[in-house]
Amino acid sequence: MVSIRPDEISSILKQQITDYDQSVNVSNVGTVLQIGDGIARIYGLDQVMAGELLEFEDGTEGIALNLEDDNVGAVLMGEALGVQEGSNVKSTGKIASVPVGEAMKGRVVNPLGQPIDGKGEIPTSDNRLIEEMAPGIIKRRSVHEPMQTGITSIDAMIPVGRGQRELIIGDRQTGKTAIAIDTIINQKGQDVVCVYVAIGQKSASVANVVEVLREKGALEYTVVVSAGASEAAALQYLAPYTGAAIAEHFMYQGKATLVIYDDLTKQAQAYRQMSLLLRRPPGREAYPGDVFYCHSRLLERAAKLSDDMGGGSMTALPIIETQAGDVSAYIPTNVISITDGQIFLSADLFNSGLRPAINVGISVSRVGGAAQTKAIKKIAGTLKLELAQFDELAAFSQFASDLDEATQQQLERGKRLRELLKQAQFSPLNLAEQVAVVYAGVKGLIDEVPVEDVTKFAAELREYLKLNKAEFIEEILKEKKLNEGLETTLKEVIKEVKSSMLATV
């Protein structure tokens, strides 16, 4: 017969009592009442927060947007083929966040920060909320450093500074993305982290951009966030905020960052789709009343931080697509009023062969002038005015038969200036090259060069400087100003290149 050992039994009971966990897992659970078009109406979830992440039975995630008396309206971030009426939904108690850090560089991710480039998981433990408060006034300082785009017409006439929001606006197929990609390529060696956010683009277009960045060696300091045209509206809506969060991480570490939102028109359309399906009241052009806030809270996150905050910066280049050049539509006017200036691309100029097709007359940079380098500021001061006057005179001269000599001279110089500012795609110029080219045009040193040879002259001038006057380029890149000695050297070089070219013409 087995003997009973009370001491052993009591010790086991004590151990069991000690190990007993009284905590209860309380989760807020609801039931799907209605589902369709990427929207779910859910009964229950009384404790849910606005913007909280929800988890459906099949693992699909959603975001609670409408908190009504008897139900919650949520948008789904995926196809959610397994979700149906009666499915259970659980609130997570979390707001959407995204992985951030050095490991993100060179990767292509979706708006949830998940890699979509086939290179495996991203080894980072840092996370950041997708929606963050913009830095306040005390945390900022005024824009004072240049963000060189490498595009002469922009750096000379519509300069962009670090921490600025400069809108790129124009019809489809006018070279908006090309300007943004050129700017990313030009940041090579500048210790700037770039984030390219593609919203509602064709997957082939995004793959093409990634390939160009890889070829030019720019992917190593760039993060690409892509929400394709086939993705859920909720993901297209979230993509820009994800890009801002990734850039913010580096900004608060004291680094300079550049974010391209390509383009916010498609984000606004995705938000309109979600809002109408959630039965929010429509406003102008059927957009919801808070579409302005949707863009303003995103673009206000771009800033130049004060030295106490580390001195980092986030420069934003949002892109807006217009219909037939109509900048007075709802979304274009909204974003123009939020940003610190706009670069307007004209379809007519593009079709006439002017690339980049920048309409200088209505393009403006409201704060970039303070950040422009002394070298380019000194010589490009009159460039914008001269080109604007040229456009006016060119239109007028079509109807006038006899023009006085001064007007003819102005027209001739304007034609040459316009030719000088033409630039091939993916070939950004450094500051010294820009200074040389603009100086030659503004000072009238190429008035004798035939208009059709101006582009060739500019290329030969740059080549000559690289081969024979490397110290000139180094000096300007180092000092960022054009002193008398450098100016004399430049005049001699221009004269030499011009005479050798005219001799062969």
UniProtKB/Swiss-Prot annotation:
E.C. number(s) listed in UniProt: 7.1.2.2
Subcellular location: Cellular thylakoid membrane
Positions marked as site (Required for activity): 363
Domain of life where this protein originates: Bacteria
GO CC terms of this entry: plasma membrane-derived thylakoid membrane; proton-transporting ATP synthase complex
Reaction equation(s) it catalyzes: ATP + H2O + 4 H(+)(in) = ADP + phosphate + 5 H(+)(out)
Main location: membrane
Amino-acid positions noted as binding ATP in the UniProt annotation, renumbered to this chain: 170-177
GO molecular function: ADP binding; ATP binding; proton-transporting ATP synthase activity, rotational mechanism
Coiled coil: none
Pfam families noted in UniProt: ATP-synt_ab (PF00006), ATP-synt_ab_C (PF00306), ATP-synt_ab_N (PF02874)
Topology in membrane: Peripheral membrane protein
SUPFAM superfamilies the UniProt entry points to: C-terminal domain of alpha and beta subunits of F1 ATP synthase, N-terminal domain of alpha and beta subunits of F1 ATP synthase, P-loop containing nucleoside triphosphate hydrolases
InterPro entries according to UniProt: ATP_synth_asu-like_sf (IPR023366), ATP_synth_asu_C (IPR000793), ATP_synth_asu_C_sf (IPR038376), ATP_synth_F1_a_nt-bd_dom (IPR033732), ATP_synth_F1_asu (IPR005294), ATPase_a/bsu_AS (IPR020003), ATPase_F1/V1/A1_a/bsu_N (IPR004100), ATPase_F1/V1/A1_a/bsu_N_sf (IPR036121)
Keyword line: ATP synthesis, ATP-binding, CF(1), Hydrogen ion transport, Ion transport, Membrane, Nucleotide-binding, Thylakoid, Translocase, Transport
Keyword Iron-sulfur: no
Alphabetized NCBIfam families for the sequence: atpA, PRK13343.1
Sequence similarity: Belongs to the ATPase alpha/beta chains family.
Binding partners and assembly: F-type ATPases have 2 components, CF(1) - the catalytic core - and CF(0) - the membrane proton channel. CF(1) has five subunits: alpha(3), beta(3), gamma(1), delta(1), epsilon(1). CF(0) has four main subunits: a(1), b(1), b'(1) and c(9-12).
Its biological purpose: Produces ATP from ADP in the presence of a proton gradient across the membrane. The alpha chain is a regulatory subunit.
UniProt cross-references to PANTHER family, sorted A to Z: ATP SYNTHASE SUBUNIT ALPHA, MITOCHONDRIAL
Protein name as annotated: ATP synthase subunit alpha
